Amino acid sequence: MSFDIAKYPTLALVDSTQELRLLPKESLPKLCDELRRYLLDSVSRSSGHFASGLGTVELTVALHYVYNTPFDQLIWDVGHQAYPHKILTGRRDKIGTIRQKGGLHPFPWRGESEYDVLSVGHSSTSISAGIGIAVAAEKEGKNRRTVCVIGDGAITAGMAFEAMNHAGDIRPDMLVVLNDNEMSISENVGALNNHLAQLLSGKLYSSLREGGKKVFSGVPPIKELLKRTEEHIKGMVVPGTLFEELGFNYIGPVDGHDVLGLITTLKNMRDLKGPQFLHIMTKKGRGYEPAEKDPITFHAVPKFDPSSGCLPKSSGGLPSYSKIFGDWLCETAAKDNKLMAITPAMREGSGMVEFSRKFPDRYFDVAIAEQHAVTFAAGLAIGGYKPIVAIYSTFLQRAYDQVLHDVAIQKLPVLFAIDRAGIVGADGQTHQGAFDLSYLRCIPEMVIMTPSDENECRQMLYTGYHYNDGPSAVRYPRGNAVGVELTPLEKLPIGKGIVKRRGEKLAILNFGTLMPDAAKVAESLNATLVDMRFVKPLDEALILEMAASHEALVTVEENAIMGGAGSGVNEVLMAHRKPVPVLNIGLPDFFIPQGTQEEMRAELGLGAAGMEAKIKAWLA
């Protein structure tokens, strides 16, 4: 879409942060209003993360107004809230391409702009990186400042607290801004508290604070009295004791939608030494009533009509794999009160809403704490319960040691329901489920299953749930199932594949939901088609049978080729001295960028036409 100067006259003046800083302060509330309307106009046309950005408009304007970005370094955690940042940093006219193939990246991305200091997508990394950046800036000696913006969800993760604990120890000059967008604004946010925040961040208070500590440093009782008095004054209106104990100078909470007040507080804090912590209160979805009322639904949106206030309803076609999992979960829980389900802040995405309502005492959302989720599941298993960890492939990476040390070594029966396996689409490099087969396949005692359709998915979940000799995993993709009939649940024989079609010369060994395309290729080439079903243990007898009765083999998977299921097939053949030619089809050795699932599969040759072309070229 073209930028409408008449509709956004103040925003039209801002092509860069340098131009932003030339605006008089009095014009900034109008800029915020236009920026918020432009964000609504753009995202409703293009789709994308929405409610978080609406809540950070004033903060974004204030930060870029006070700090000399990009010389001063601004780090956004996760990046859902960074759309206004992109608009103000030279990407205004391209914001309509965000999350699209070849368009703006969905998150801050170092390769896209000098303003994007840290590439992000996963949560709770900003403070750790910010400490390193701040230490480097101190050694550089050019008075470069470092600011990290982190949300109230992301700050609950252990990594954020590890970083803050370290910052309190080495005391770098840096600012952490906590964007607290809980549903209700705290009672502490108001004129008195905003005034106190400006007072406590001001030079007079800061110099008195430090000077008093120096003067009375040799008099322990008075030093302690001063500390307690300061804490008492702050404690009357602020909840910052935890952050003070970690070594930060805590200011807040303040109104995150008062752009002029934020500018005053940030200017006061900019030159303070040591780690600083500014707590701001915002409203997710600010300025668009439907998003304010339902920020979860409006967190990420498809294209929609803003005037209607409603998102388009799904077509009501085939269920998603997440829905298949959620239905199976409820069905199984109704029969077995030992079932416990765990998610790290992915209730909606993992299809667990209905389960959480029907079985609240057996549902555990542990927040953004993947490591804890896995070891918590281990504890439940030790206690005689049957835990299921529902987690995205890309986030399971964050709990790898816990899978190894706390579950697999102890042979605990934990079922991992791995959603978003393979290509996920618009979220790009940081969210592709490209590696789970590779990083799980090497773990002893692990059973790994790859369903080819929703019925197999249910049977495999059932099989894994009833497997008691160690951990098991079922991986399934983002998107809709294929529409096969659902049959009664029964346990599958562990490590056994099935031949779906008999052909000649060539055998295609398929792992997972690329099966419909693999079937088309097998039909076209008159190839044998095998649904391998298990990545671990592999059906070695079936692999050797295919090698003995065919001239060449092809493996198909939506996982990195390196270390994936196809690599396992190669290992079996080499171990048995069967030098049969094998073509491994899967994800190549680079991070897959954004684009729709269909676009990326076509580009990578994972559709029927692409697979057939690869096979023909290889056989030629």
Swiss-Prot record:
UniProt xrefs under PROSITE patterns: TRANSKETOLASE_1, TRANSKETOLASE_2
Pathway: Metabolic intermediate biosynthesis; 1-deoxy-D-xylulose 5-phosphate biosynthesis; 1-deoxy-D-xylulose 5-phosphate from D-glyceraldehyde 3-phosphate and pyruvate: step 1/1
GO MF, one example: magnesium ion binding
A Pfam cross-reference name: DXP_synthase_N
InterPro entries in UniProt: Dxylulose-5-P_synthase, THDP-binding, Transketo_C/PFOR_II, Transketolase-like_Pyr-bd, Transketolase_BS, Transketolase_C, Transketolase_CS
Iron-sulfur found in the keyword field: no
Record GO biological process: 1-deoxy-D-xylulose 5-phosphate biosynthetic process; isopentenyl diphosphate biosynthetic process, methylerythritol 4-phosphate pathway; terpenoid biosynthetic process; thiamine biosynthetic process
Enzyme class: transferase
Catalytic activity: D-glyceraldehyde 3-phosphate + pyruvate + H(+) = 1-deoxy-D-xylulose 5-phosphate + CO2
Keyword annotations: Isoprene biosynthesis, Magnesium, Metal-binding, Thiamine biosynthesis, Thiamine pyrophosphate, Transferase
Required cofactor(s): Mg(2+); thiamine diphosphate
Residues reported to bind thiamine diphosphate: H80, G121, H122, S123, G153, A154, N181, Y288, E370
Binding site for Mg(2+): D152, N181
EC number: 2.2.1.7
Gene Ontology CC: cytosol
Nucleus is among the record's keywords: no
Cofactor annotation comment: Binds 1 Mg(2+) ion per subunit.
Stored HAMAP family: DXP_synth (MF_00315)
Subunit architecture: Homodimer.
Role, per record: Catalyzes the acyloin condensation reaction between C atoms 2 and 3 of pyruvate and glyceraldehyde 3-phosphate to yield 1-deoxy-D-xylulose-5-phosphate (DXP).
NCBIfam families: dxs (TIGR00204), PRK05444.2-2 (NF003933)
Family statement: Belongs to the transketolase family. DXPS subfamily.
Cross-referenced PANTHER family: 1-D-DEOXYXYLULOSE 5-PHOSPHATE SYNTHASE-RELATED (PTHR43322), 1-DEOXY-D-XYLULOSE-5-PHOSPHATE SYNTHASE, CHLOROPLASTIC (PTHR43322:SF5)
Name by which UniProt lists this protein: 1-deoxy-D-xylulose-5-phosphate synthase
Organism: Escherichia coli (strain 55989 / EAEC)
